[in-house]
Amino acid sequence: MASVRKRKMAKSSVKKVSRRNKDKQKQVNIKGNPIIAENWDYSLTLAQNYKKLGLKVKMGKFAGGEEADLSKVIKKDVYEHSAFSDDESEDEKDSQGEEDEDDVNLEELNSDGEYDESKIPEGEARIKRDDDGNIVKVYYGKRKAIDIDMDVEELRRENEKNEVKTEVVKKLEAYASRPVAKKERGLSQREDQWLEQLYKKHGDNYKKMFFDKKLNVYQQTENVLRRKILKWKELHNIE
């Protein structure tokens, strides 16, 4: 036979704590847009899905917490310390290595880790050297600088030319630019009855309608009442 305490615990309204399946609770269910829902990969995170679809999670720059892009690999020379080398030569190598590392801008590299000329500003160049310091290739910048006097629409068109769009983005743009019929707001049943009472009592005298405290409870102005009465007349074919 159970003790008094156990019987009280069994009758208590407080439920026993149980584990829950967090993955099922936090699973994203895309319902807003059919194109995004069709191409959404539930095995990836939100940021990874947006990057794959060609969208942006945030319009500005991230302050941190971004996933490292492992496709861009920068080869670094292994530093070999020799007991017979001079201190001055070592310092020169260290400073030169630091300068080379600082000069590399990750935003100017492509997926293969090579310089992309379309990402380098026009009038600048980037030099690629081999292990001995000899020049292998020179990348000349082709990205044009932004003109301050340029029109906003013209600037937007220029950015759209340089921007590489995914198939999902193209479908979304076509979906957004489709012609949509404008749906006008109709009168509700109660609003129709209220306008009918106003018209039967005051006719076309909108000033009296405005000062009618019993019918015009929300103190709608003469112009608002006029527009609503004209709409009501058109609906009921009243001249």
UniProtKB/Swiss-Prot annotation:
One cellular-component annotation, GO: nucleolus
Key word Mitochondrion present: no
Cell compartment(s), UniProt: Nucleus, Nucleolus
Compositional bias per record (Basic residues), positions renumbered to this chain: 1-23
Pfam family, one: Nop16
Keyword tags: Nucleus, Ribonucleoprotein, Ribosome biogenesis, rRNA processing
InterPro entries, per database record: Ribosome_biogenesis_Nop16 (IPR019002)
Biased composition (Acidic residues): 85-115
Main localization category: nucleus
Region annotation (Disordered) ranges: 1-31, 81-124
A biological process from GO: rRNA processing
Top-level taxon of the source organism: Eukaryota
Summary of subunit composition and partner proteins: Component of the pre-66S ribosomal particle.
Biological role stated in the UniProt entry: Involved in the biogenesis of the 60S ribosomal subunit.
The family this protein is said to belong to: Belongs to the NOP16 family.
Protein name: Nucleolar protein 16
Top-level taxonomy: Eukaryota, Fungi, Dikarya, Ascomycota, Saccharomycotina
Gene behind this protein: NOP16
